Amino acid sequence: ETIARKEEKESVDKLRLWLIENNFNKGINIDEDTKRYYPYNNFASHIIGFCGSDNQGLGGIEAKYDKILSGEKGRITRVKDGSGKEIDGTVEQYINATDGNGIITTIDMGVQSIVEKYLEEACIDNKCTDGGNVVVMDPTNGNILAMATYPTYNLNKPYEIVNNEISEKWDALSTKERNEALQAMWRNKAIADTYEPGSTFKLVTTSAALEEGITSPDNSGEFCCSGSITIAGVRIKCWRYYRPHGSQSLRQALMNSCNPIFIGLGQKLGVETYYSYLERFGFLNKTGIDLPGEAKGIFLDKSKVGPVELATISFGQRFEVTPIQMITMVSTIANKGKRMKPRLVKGTINSVTGEIEEFQPECTR
């Protein structure tokens, strides 16, 4: 019977010493095995993922690129008859095991380290009980330079809960509750969680309006904020309704984050056109990033969007998107309208020859 698997060398060495000191040489066998070791412990844990007891990838890059990383086991093949006896004249075939290949990530360790450090500080200082995430992306090629979720977990101890409140009552939890707690800890918020983007989404409304020729950036006095706007009988306030922004250009309206101006632009665009831009920016589908567990945005069906719904969408409310969708949108604008597919792996290294195979960036629009 197997008592324990994948134990740390330090623990096994202590057991060996105890067996020797107590002259205990029967009944207990120690078989050497290998397992994945992560030298940086918590670093980029939600990106890298980890392996199970059978060395199969269970999350992150480990799961997505499991076949490339795993290699193939060696084996011996023999030809036998129906009774299981080897057939005379046949030859055994020995097929050697092959190591898995290495992968080259897009992550910049310096940027990742800085992001993780300040994300942790921000979450602690602001008492973010649900944690947080940060994504840094190169707009020109889709390379993810950093992707951090807080809190992190130790890749060498992936079943060790980091939430003190949960760990204190761990023994009292049901199997279902334990699994849910672990899944929550492993969850990469940057790709799997959705949120309401708010005023940051005004970039989409601005881009669509400019592209359609409805407005221009610096037409002084083109817009006027009176503190609110009425759409289909519903009054929607500007955040600064108590002291309206007054006369503005588009650039100024964006700087002021003036809701009524973007509501008006959304009405001029109309539902069909606005949703076509949601599609072009990639909000109605997953980005296709090379990680498992990606979610997609949550929007009202186009047929159910009336003037009021379109008004709230125009300034970033009543729908949800993922962080990776948002940074893909911003990167598309920065890249002059070319939407690059976000990626975390840019190549592989052949374990035998050392040859590098580079993956080309993919433009999805």
For the regions a language model picked out, list residue spans one by one.
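Small/polar-residue-rich segments within soluble enzyme cores
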Residues: E1-G100
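Short N-terminal helix-loop-first-beta-strand/juxtamembrane motif that initiates sensory/input modules
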Residues: F24-N29, I124-P139
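Short, small/polar residue-rich loop motifs at catalytic or cofactor-binding pockets
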Residues: K73, K127-G131, Y195, F223
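Beta-lactam-recognizing serine transpeptidase/beta-lactamase-like catalytic domain environment
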Residues: D81-E92, T140-T200, V204-R365
